[in-house]
């Protein structure tokens, strides 16, 4: 391990120059607890309010004093990358890892409760004993932890690695050029790799971007599970030819709404006599889905999209799926005048009757979303 006094000097250099982000390259930064604790304490004590430090850790190795220290840090001071790779016990054993997933899940949830740390969790496709169904389960296990980023990677069969040695036994086929990415295994044929590539793309666009958080929470109950949502969304992109074209942010919303409409119609067709497509939330997550509504309809999804859009920015042009604001313009103008609402803020009337004020001068320090409050006009 690098001398701690030298590390402190180097850290101070970054802090003095207000470097936006510093990444530690240790694969398991917290394997030596005293070393990790000293560094975390130093960056907390010398926080410049700007620099973010990225660490790759094993969450199930974190100790109580480390968690307590993390809970006191400035939002955004550190972010954690946690390599789960798989939740299949046979897979974990085959890659010579030890991981207590229930313990890891508990710690990830605890860190979530601090509301000050970005967590990035990863899964690796192409590992031994992990077929498509097993990866499906691993995905749902990790997705349920709601990390800020869920990174789907594909096995790299590096020269000299254990996976390279086991190529024949595991039936691994990989690219001949760097980074030697897996193309198939005994358990996961090339066709399934391609399907997972599409899932990865959808997760990157609609989950990891953070731009569709409330919309995705609203849409999820329409599907058997989270993996199925992204799988079907990817299939929709391919069917419509959308995967071959680059799209604007607004177009991504329109495509998702188009997808939801088709899904609602298909589900409605399977229910005799249902003229108004409405799907009950099987998980009963009323507080989380559709901004407090227990059912998903096209209108509620559209409202969730408007909410997500205005959380990020005060739109210059109105989306095609926005609720008509014209009947409320006079009342909104009068409210702005009386309450001296700054021009930078936005007021939106939703289909459910709620009126929300988006304050862009006060943003969430971790997610950078606008502060929101309900008003009466």
Give names to the regions the model predicted.
Residues 1-113:
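Radical SAM [4Fe-4S] cluster-binding motif and immediate context
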Residues 105-131:
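Mobile, glycine- and charge-enriched loop segments
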Residues 33-34, 84, 90-95, 125-134, ...:
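Flexible glycine/acidic-rich beta-alpha junction loops that bind and position SAM and/or redox cofactors
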């Amino acid at each position: 391990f690098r001398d701690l006094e030298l590390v402190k000097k180097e850290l101070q250099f970054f802090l003095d120059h207000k470097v936006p982000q510093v990444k530690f390259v240790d694969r398991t930064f917290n394997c030596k607890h005293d070393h990790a604790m000293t560094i975390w304490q130093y960056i907390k004590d010398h926080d410049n309010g700007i620099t973010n430090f990225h660490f790759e850790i094993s969450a199930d190795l974190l100790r109580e004093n480390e968690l307590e220290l993390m809970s006191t840090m400035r939002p955004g001071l550190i972010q954690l990358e946690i390599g789960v790779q798989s939740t299949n016990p046979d897979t974990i054993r085959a890659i010579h890892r030890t991981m207590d997933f229930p313990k890891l899940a508990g710690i990830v949830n605890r860190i979530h409760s601090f509301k000050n740390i970005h967590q990035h969790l990863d899964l690796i496709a192409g590992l031994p004993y992990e077929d498509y169904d097993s990866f499906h389960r691993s995905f749902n296990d990790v997705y349920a932890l709601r990390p800020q980023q869920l990174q789907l990677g594909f096995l790299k069969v590096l020269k000299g690695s254990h996976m390279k040695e086991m190529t024949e036994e595991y039936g691994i086929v990989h690219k001949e050029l760097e980074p030697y990415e897996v193309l198939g295994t005994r358990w996961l044929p090339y066709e399934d790799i391609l399907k997972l590539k599409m899932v990865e793309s959808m997760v990157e666009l609609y989950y990891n971007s953070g731009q569709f958080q409330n919309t995705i929470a609203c849409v999820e109950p329409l599907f058997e599970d989270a993996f199925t949502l992204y799988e079907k969304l990817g299939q929709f992109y391919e069917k419509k030819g959308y995967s071959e074209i680059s799209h604007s942010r607004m177009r991504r919303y329109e495509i998702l709404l188009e997808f939801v409409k088709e899904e609602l119609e298909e589900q409605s067709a399977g229910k005799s006599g249902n003229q108004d497509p409405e799907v009950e939330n099987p998980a009963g997550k009323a507080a989380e889905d559709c901004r407090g509504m227990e059912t998903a309809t096209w209108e509620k999804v559209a409202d969730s999209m408007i909410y997500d859009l205005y959380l990020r920015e005060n739109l210059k042009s109105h989306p095609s799926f926005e609720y008509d604001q014209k009947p409320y313009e006079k009342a909104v103008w009068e409210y702005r005048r009386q309450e001296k609402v700054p021009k930078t803020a936005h007021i939106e009337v939703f289909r459910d009757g709620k009126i929300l004020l988006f304050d862009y001068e006060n943003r969430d320090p971790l997610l950078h979303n606008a502060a929101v409050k309900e008003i009466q006009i």
